[in-house]
Amino acid sequence: MRIRALLALVVCMLACAGCTKKKSTDELVQDLKAKDDKSRLIAVRLLPQHKGDAAKAVPALIEALKDTESDVRISAAVGLGYFGDEAKDAIPALQAAQKDHDARVREAAGVALTRIDPARFPARSKGRPSGRK
């Protein structure tokens, strides 16, 4: 019985050996084209971890701002913010995302703009409406 349990454990460990493999930027960009929402969401959330590959990740995240799923669009905006000034090409797309029908996308886009270019897009105070003292 112990041998069976040990054998089952070894089989499980071997099966999961590839589970923790970190995907490349190219693989994640490809996953953004998947038909299922979950794959796209995972990819868009992992892309910001590839900061050294901004040239590939940023255009893919810009494209993800047009996804049909709002969670993917939110994560794309957040991810672009993580790239900071390396994501300046995303500014027009993020400004367009500020008109999204989902308020969470609009807010994420605003935060991303502030992180990308704080001089041009200063953070707004949540405590008071803009334009009032």
PLM segments and residue spans:
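Short inter-helical turns and helix N-cap capping residues of alpha-solenoid HEAT/ARM repeat scaffolds
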Residues: 35-36, 68-69, 101-102
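Immediate post-signal-peptide N-terminus of mature secreted/exported proteins
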Residues: 25-36, 45
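Short, solvent-exposed mixed-charge patches
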Residues: 131-133
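Sec-dependent bacterial lipoprotein signal peptides
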Residues: 1-17
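N-terminal non-cleavable signal-anchor helices
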Residues: 11-12, 59, 92, 112
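Amphipathic alpha-helical scaffolding segments comprising HEAT/armadillo-like alpha-solenoid repeats
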Residues: 20-30, 52-65, 85-97, 119-128
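Structural detector for internal amphipathic alpha-helices that build alpha-solenoid repeat scaffolds
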Residues: 19-21, 38-53, 71-86, 106-119
